[in-house]
Regions:
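Hydrophobic core of alpha-helical transmembrane segments in multi-pass integral membrane proteins
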Residues: 23-40, 87-101, 154-166, 193-210, ...
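Extracellular/periplasmic helix-loop-helix junctions in multi-pass membrane proteins
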Residues: 237-243, 297-316
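Central hydrophobic cores of alpha-helical transmembrane segments in multi-pass inner-membrane proteins
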Residues: 2-6, 52-74, 123-126
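Membrane-interface helix-loop-helix junctions at boundaries between adjacent transmembrane segments
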Residues: 77, 99-189
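C-terminal ends of transmembrane helices
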Residues: 65-76, 127-133, 204-214, 325, ...
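Membrane-interface helix-boundary motifs at transmembrane edges
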Residues: 73-84, 135-146, 208-218, 269-275
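N-terminal signal-anchor module of multipass membrane proteins
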Residues: 2-57, 330-331
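Predominantly late transmembrane helices and immediately cytosolic-facing juxtamembrane segments
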Residues: 128-132, 249-266
Length: 351
């Protein structure tokens, strides 16, 4: 008899159905589409995507930014537990945005750089949070070392973007004269190359080690989430407007899927005559879509009517919405002593 533990791959306990969870939350659909566009030689599909990309961004990404705000104000106890987030942060955001538009070369430039630097960090944090959720749902015990290594694996793609992308990240916080030094350029390029490999290798190694130990603490869907994020931030380069837009569509789908699940599962358990789950889901998405349209398509024109330039109004409104979303998102996903934990530990299926 072999003394090696039996291999047991845990697919992860889905929130809805394995196909739904793997394709939308796990990022599997994004990998299929990206692979098809990259290797499938489908010019018609590529042309359709380019033609309708900004409609997809509205339906997915704009709605997902609004979704964190809708979730904040519909989550029970938000005004009581998060008074600054619900009442003070919106006013502070408008004030900072107005000053940034009035001073685009100063505060506006830094707001834009903050948004571009924070965005891949937010992606990494979302990947880590989702991976941990499925780990909790698998029921396997997790040590602090396990969480630490999973966090490192999740944030390696962010570090790659931080060092690799121009105009933000390290180029925002370090003087250009320092970065142009030959030694600095060599260290930077070497770190970028190393992080590119580690972003894909580290999650796979953690997963394989867990299988070897026979405990299968990292579900397969958690590995898929981490690798999808590595493809988005590292594999696609995160450099051209087209690739960034494609990535934001799938990131938005991922976020909207899990956000809607949490909202609906809380609502259908409401004691006072809950409506069917599909009505709750459609109503929530409709609110996210409507608010997203107002924020991204209408709000910039308010500053144009006040006499500010169109370009800086659009760009800085987008930056302010992103930063507001990043802050809100950090608070609405708490698991301990929160209704979110009941959703994470619940059985699959919405209704």
């Amino acid at each position: 008899m072999s003394s090696h533990p039996r291999l047991r791959v845990d697919p992860g306990r889905p929130f809805i159905h394995p196909a739904f969870d793997y394709l939308l939350i796990g990022g599997g659909l994004s990998l299929l589409v990206i692979g098809w566009l990259t290797f499938g030689r489908a010019p018609a599909v590529r042309q359709w995507l380019q033609t309708n990309l900004w409609t997809l961004v509205l339906l997915s990404n704009s709605a997902h930014f609004a979704g964190s705000t809708v979730r904040l104000y519909t989550k029970p106890g938000s005004f009581r537990d998060l008074p600054f987030l619900t009442m003070g942060l919106p006013l502070a955001s408008v004030a900072v945005l107005t000053l940034a538009i009035a001073w685009p070369g100063g505060l506006g430039r830094h707001l834009q750089s903050l948004y571009l630097t924070w965005s891949p960090y937010h992606y990494a944090a979302q990947a880590y949070g989702l991976a941990v959720m499925y780990c909790y749902r698998s029921g396997s015990p997790w040590t602090e070392d396990d969480k630490r290594w999973l966090r490192i694996a999740s944030f390696l793609p962010f570090l790659h973007v931080f060092l690799a992308v121009g105009g933000a990240g390290i180029e925002w916080v370090m003087p250009a004269a320092v970065l142009r030094q030959p030694a600095a350029e060599a260290v930077r390029s070497g770190a970028v190359a190393g992080l590119r490999v580690l972003s894909f290798l580290t999650p796979a190694v953690i997963f394989l080690l867990h299988q070897r130990e026979g405990r299968s603490r990292l579900p397969l869907i958690s590995l898929l989430i981490l690798l999808s994020n590595s493809v988005w931030l590292v594999g696609l380069g995160y450099t051209t407007p087209l690739t960034i837009a494609v990535v934001t569509v799938f990131h938005g789908l991922q976020y909207l899927a899990i956000l809607t699940i949490f909202h609906v599962k809380e609502r259908v358990r409401a004691p006072a005559g809950p409506r069917p789950w599909w009505i709750q889901a459609l109503g929530f998405y409709a609110a996210c879509l409507a608010l997203g349209y107002v924020l991204f398509q209408v709000w910039p024109y308010a500053y144009v009517l006040l006499g500010f330039g169109f370009a800086e109004s659009v760009l800085l409104v987008i930056a302010a919405i992103n930063v507001h979303h990043f802050v809100v998102d950090a608070f609405i996903w708490r698991l301990r002593r929160d209704s979110n934990y009941a959703v994470v530990s619940a059985q699959p299926a919405v209704g």
